[in-house]
From Swiss-Prot:
It is found in: Cell membrane. The lineage of its organism: Eukaryota, Metazoa, Chordata, Craniata, Vertebrata. CDD domains: IgV_pIgR_like. This is CMRF35-like molecule 5. Residues 19-125 form the Ig-like V-type domain. GO terms for biological process: immune response-activating signaling pathway. Residues 1-18 form the signal peptide. Glycans are attached at residue 28. It is a single-pass type I membrane protein.
């Protein structure tokens, strides 16, 4: 059976645009200070939701803050997030840092199918200074200020079975595909001759 490209787009949502997300591997902050991390994403994902979550396990991390699809800043408790869609960078700021904020965090982009994300290890030092991880564009490479290690994490993808979008699309598309298959089989059934 031949499937049209438009049908393949229905079957494989979120796979039609190549995407990648990058950010610093480690960032240091000081107790009672603030910490800013910038994560970059590929073209085509400007209006998708961006998020920051906490926890070493990608599939079970706790989402702290999420954008609303615009460039408007969203703040929840001590964490804020702002998406610069023109530059394909979103910025997450944590304020009034505590020692127990030291943990693994993830910058992520919510999309149909599989979310994209990159792990950022945060360490908190005693003291009261502000740490900033900043992107500088220089000849297609990314550089960070001294507050962050000068390398990027490799992106990970979230399991599609953990994504509510995937489950919703699966439950929506499955009956459609089954009815299409039934129609094709019914049209191509052998005809009885009298």
């Amino acid at each position: 059976m031949w499937l049209s490209p438009s049908l393949l787009l229905l079957i494989l949502p979120g796979y039609s645009i190549a995407a990648k997300i990058t950010g610093p591997t480690t960032v240091n902050g000081s107790e009672q200070g603030s910490l800013t991390v910038q994560c970059a994403y590929g073209s085509g994902w400007e209006t998708y939701l961006k998020w920051r979550c906490q926890g070493a396990d990608w599939n079970y991390c706790n989402i702290l803050v999420k954008t609303n699809g615009s460039e408007q800043e969203v703040k929840k408790n001590r964490v804020s997030i702002r998406d610069n869609q023109k530059n394909h960078v979103f910025t997450v700021t944590m304020e009034n840092l505590k020692r127990d904020d030291a943990d693994s965090y993830w910058c992520g982009t919510e999309r149909p199918g599989i979310d994209l994300g990159v792990k950022v290890q945060v360490t908190i030092n005693p003291g009261t200074q502000t740490a900033v991880s900043e992107w500088t564009t220089t000849t297609a490479s990314l550089a960070f200020t001294a507050a962050a290690t000068q390398k990027t994490s490799s992106p990970l993808t979230r399991s599609p079975l953990k994504s509510t979008h995937f489950l919703f699309l699966f439950l929506l598309e499955l009956p459609l595909l089954l009815s299409m298959l039934g129609t094709v089989l019914w049209v191509n059934r052998p005809q009885r001759r009298s």
